Design a protein with these regions (language model features):
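Preference for bulky hydrophobic residues occupying beta-strand positions
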Residues: 25, 38, 246-248, 279, ...
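ABC transporter nucleotide-binding domain
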Residues: 189-282
């Protein structure tokens, strides 16, 4: 038995497995997704990153045939989502917010049910269930009913259920929401292994660390519109700015520091808990010296400072807060 999909639907690593072109979806006068396009490749994790209400789940529902596409087109391993929905459903897995496992059944019973729905032969079904239970370390709780599971155990079962038919494409809709850090990290490891074995993974998330760690490519969306796309490194480089972090000694200093810094570098943010200023700079060395001069002139007592490269957090906040496109 193997974790690879049947040869007739297999996609070579690096080739496009999911293609979305100019997708649009509205609910009455509310536009949920506008002219959205991206590709996801076999053997990679494509992260769809955005705040709550950005259109991530709506996009996933359209790609997995759960919602009709208003306009635009999408294909999954060459199958047209709108014209061939039954065929598409046979080659995808879906886990996350809309997982369909039955809380009154055990993990084994749920997986047996899914295997029968996919018409997997009995012997192969038994082997596959045993393999997945072992691989995802579910042996200790596989015979308990699902409603007794912890959040991490439930999420693990959701992912395993989506893999029962060895799909070449896996959609994960915010799969780690509500998990504790340890369970989240364990699930990240499993998702990474799936991609390494050739699965195309489309992951929606609002966790920046998750997108940064897991995703080979990232699409940032806000209000249903693509704001930026590329690798994490490309997005950080394209932001074309450094961040100057300055720690001050008191709240009084912080207030004066914000006012003074804005004269040199607009867009200053502050953290009263850490007595920290974060100042975006387009000319790091020159502007950082200018900031220190104006802070000194304003009588601000500085305890520490550093100039750093932007993080994915900086990219995300810039693009979703200002409405800017890159």
């Amino acid at each position: 038995m193997t974790d690879r999909p049947p040869p007739e639907v297999a996609v070579a690593n690096g080739n496009v497995a999911v293609s979305a072109r100019n997708l649009n979806k509205s609910y009455g006068d509310t536009v949920a997704v506008r002219d959205l396009s991206f590709d996801a490749r076999a053997g990679e994790v494509m992260g769809l990153l955005g705040p709550n209400g950005a259109g991530k789940t709506t996009t996933i529902k359209m790609l997995t045939t759960l919602l009709p596409i208003d306009t635009g087109s999408a294909t999954i391993v060459g199958l047209d989502v709108a014209a061939q929905p039954d065929a598409v459903r046979r080659v995808i897995g879906l886990a996350g917010q809309a997982a369909a496992v039955d809380g009154k059944l055990t993990a084994h019973e749920n997986l047996e049910m899914f295997g029968r729905l996919y018409k997997i032969p009995r012997v192969e079904r038994k082997l596959r269930i045993g393999h997945l239970v072992e691989r995802f370390d579910m042996g200790e709780f596989a015979e308990r009913v699902v409603e007794t599971y912890s959040g991490g155990q439930r999420r693990r079962l959701d992912v395993v259920a989506s893999l029962i038919a060895a799909p070449p494409v896996l959609f994960l809709d915010e799969p780690t929401t509500g998990l504790d850090p340890r369970s989240r990290t364990e699930l990240w490891d499993e998702i990474g292994e799936l991609a390494e074995q050739g699965t195309a993974v489309v992951l929606t998330t609002q966790y920046l660390e998750e997108a940064d760690r897991l995703s080979d490519r990232i699409v940032i969306i806000d209000e249903g519109v693509v704001k930026a796309s590329g690798t994490s490194a490309e997005l950080k480089t394209d932001l074309e700015r450094d961040v100057f972090e300055v720690h001050v000694t008191s709240l009084e200093d912080l207030g004066r520091a914000v006012e003074a810094s804005e004269r040199v570098a607009p867009g200053v943010s502050s953290d009263t808990g850490d007595l920290l200023l974060q100042i975006p700079l387009t000319d790091g060395s020159r502007q950082s010296l200018a900031v220190l001069r104006v802070l000194d002139d304003a009588g601000v007592r500085v305890s520490d400072f550093q100039l750093r490269r932007p993080t994915l957090d900086d990219v995300f906040l810039t693009l979703t807060a200002t409405g800017g496109n890159r």
